[in-house]
Amino acid sequence: MASPFGRLTDQKGRGHPAGSGGVEVNGGSARAAFSGGGRRVLSGGGRTAFGGGGRTAFGDGGRTAFGVGGRTAFGGGGRTAFGGGGRTAFGVGGRTAFGGGERVSLLSPGWSALARSWLTASSASRVQAILLPQPPE
């Protein structure tokens, strides 16, 4: 099955489906991408992202990209990013946030969220969590 995010090229010029290893990620026009298995570090659009065992959080410089727990992945490149591990899919990046499959369902400009359980990775690079607006009391 083809990845909805197309193909990425690793540092040796070999093509791979975006999201190899069970995690599909594309952060901001392929600026950040990584493999779910953590065995390959892929480069998309000149930006490098980091993989580690499928259970480590991922980051890429100033632009954020996360994969936690081996089943859920996040990318952030300034506008829209997509992640998914079969159960959850999110777009995060200042304009759109989508959630589904577990407990979160969002569609609102400017929201960016990572559930608390996803912040328990063994290591993280610039992990962010922005609290969601609460309804008036």
From Swiss-Prot:
Domain of life, per lineage: Eukaryota
Protein name: Putative uncharacterized protein SPANXA2-OT1
Organism: Homo sapiens (Human)
Gly residues compositional bias, start-end: 16-25
Record region (Disordered): 1-30
Protein's gene: SPANXA2-OT1
